[in-house]
C-alpha cells in the first residue's frame, strides 16, 4: 500500500468542498490505489457544519481514506501537506466592489501563504480556487517564497471545461473528441476562451463551425458569463462543476495531459505570448511527471491579441490594488 498523501482543503464546510471531498476520498483525483489523509480547514463559525461533513465522510467507509483532520487552525491544516486546495474565500456580496473583494480575500491568502511557507512540504502543490483566483494565487505564492513558484497554480479549468462543453453541443460531438482548447487570461469576464487552435481529429474546430458570429457573439460571452448565469438559475454559485474542475486540474498536474492535447492553468507569466512577467495568467500547458510547461509557438491573430491584452490589463489593475499584501 502506498503512503497516504496529505490533502488540505480550505473552505471545507462549503458548497464546493461538499462536492469535492467525497470524490477525493473515493480515489477520483489520485487513483484507486492512493490512500489520502484529508486536512480540512474552515472558520470556527462553520464548525458544526464541518463536523457533519466529517461524519458523512466516515460513514462512507472509503477504503482509501486513511485519516481526517478537521480544524479552524491553519497551522494544523497545512502541516506537512502534499496538496493544498485553497477553496475558502469570502463571496462577493451585493454592493461590494471588486476591489473590496480583492482586499478582503487578499488578506486571507497572504496569511495562508505565510503558513504554507512554514509548515507545508517543500514540494507541495498548491491550487487556488477562491476568487479572484489569479491574483489570490499570486498573493499566496509571493508570501511563500521558500516554495517553488512552479508549484502554484490558479484554477481556470472550469472555464476550460465550459468552453469544451459549448463546442461539443454546437457540433453534436462528444467532449472527449475536442482537443487543444485554451482559456487565456483571468478567471473573470475578461477571460478569452480561444477555439482558434482547437481540433476534432485533424480538423480545426473553426472550420467545422464556420460561423464567426456565433464564436464572437455567443460562444465567447457564454463562457465568460456562465458563472453568473448559473447563480441566477440556481440561486447559488457553481459547486459540483467547480469541484469536478479541481479534480481534472490536479489529475492532469499529477498524471499528465493526453498526447496531442493540453489544458489551461493559471500560472506565473514568463513573457510567453507577449504577456509580461509577474502575473498569474491562463496559458495552455502540457503536464508531464508532475511538471507543467507553457505550449509555445501558437499563432495569435489580431482578434485574439486584443483579448489577451485586455485580460492582462485587468490583472495589472488587480495587482496594483493588492501590492501592499506582497512582501
Curated annotation (Swiss-Prot):
Coiled-coil annotated spans: none
Catalytic-site annotation from UniProt: 187 (proton acceptor)
Biological process, per Gene Ontology: malate metabolic process; tricarboxylic acid cycle
Recorded GO MF terms: L-malate dehydrogenase (NAD+) activity
SUPFAM superfamilies assigned to the protein according to its UniProt record, in alphabetical order: LDH C-terminal domain-like, NAD(P)-binding Rossmann-fold domains
Keywords: NAD, Oxidoreductase, Tricarboxylic acid cycle
Residues that, per the record, bind substrate: 92, 98, 131, 162
NAD among keywords: yes
E.C. number: 1.1.1.37
Recorded catalytic activity of this chain's protein: (S)-malate + NAD(+) = oxaloacetate + NADH + H(+)
TM segment ranges: none
Family membership noted in the UniProt record: Belongs to the LDH/MDH superfamily. MDH type 2 family.
Function in brief: Catalyzes the reversible oxidation of malate to oxaloacetate.
Entry protein name: Malate dehydrogenase
Amino acid at each position: 500500500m502506498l503512503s497516504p498523501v496529505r490533502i488540505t482543503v480550505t473552505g471545507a464546510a462549503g458548497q464546493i468542498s461538499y462536492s469535492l471531498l467525497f470524490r477525493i476520498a473515493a480515489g477520483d483525483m489520485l487513483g484507486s490505489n492512493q490512500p489520502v489523509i484529508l486536512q480540512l480547514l474552515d472558520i470556527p463559525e462553520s464548525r458544526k457544519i464541518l463536523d457533519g461533513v466529517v461524519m458523512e465522510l466516515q460513514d462512507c467507509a472509503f477504503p482509501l481514506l486513511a485519516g481526517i483532520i478537521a480544524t479552524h487552525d491553519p497551522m494544523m491544516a497545512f502541516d506537512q501537506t502534499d496538496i493544498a486546495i485553497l477553496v475558502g474565500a469570502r463571496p462577493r456580496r451585493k454592493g461590494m466592489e471588486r476591489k473590496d473583494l480583492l482586499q478582503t480575500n487578499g488578506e486571507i491568502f497572504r496569511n495562508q501563504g505565510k503558513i504554507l511557507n512554514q509548515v507545508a512540504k517543500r514540494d507541495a502543490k498548491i491550487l487556488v480556487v477562491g476568487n479572484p483566483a489569479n491574483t489570490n494565487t499570486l498573493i499566496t505564492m509571493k508570501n511563500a517564497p521558500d516554495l517553488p513558484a512552479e508549484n502554484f497554480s490558479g484554477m481556470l479549468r472550469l472555464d476550460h471545461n465550459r468552453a469544451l462543453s459549448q463546442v461539443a453541443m454546437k457540433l453534436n460531438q462528444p467532449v472527449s473528441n475536442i482537443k487543444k482548447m485554451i482559456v487565456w487570461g483571468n478567471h473573470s469576464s475578461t477571460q478569452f476562451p480561444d477555439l482558434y487552435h482547437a481540433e476534432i481529429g485533424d480538423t480545426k474546430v473553426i472550420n467545422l463551425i464556420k460561423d464567426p458570429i456565433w464564436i464572437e457573439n455567443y460562444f465567447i460571452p457564454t463562457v465568460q458569463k456562465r458563472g453568473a448565469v448559473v447563480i441566477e438559475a440556481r440561486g447559488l454559485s457553481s459547486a459540483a462543476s467547480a469541484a469536478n474542475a479541481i479534480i481534472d486540474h490536479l489529475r492532469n498536474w499529477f498524471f499528465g495531459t493526453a498526447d496531442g492535447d493540453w489544458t489551461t492553468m493559471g500560472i506565473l507569466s514568463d513573457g510567453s505570448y507577449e504577456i509580461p512577467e509577474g502575473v498569474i495568467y491562463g496559458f495552455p500547458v502540457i503536464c508531464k511527471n508532475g511538471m507543467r510547461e507553457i505550449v509555445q509557438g501558437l499563432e495569435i491573430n489580431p482578434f485574439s491579441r486584443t483579448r489577451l491584452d485586455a485580460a492582462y490589463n485587468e490583472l495589472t489593475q488587480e495587482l496594483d490594488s493588492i501590492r501592499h499584501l506582497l512582501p
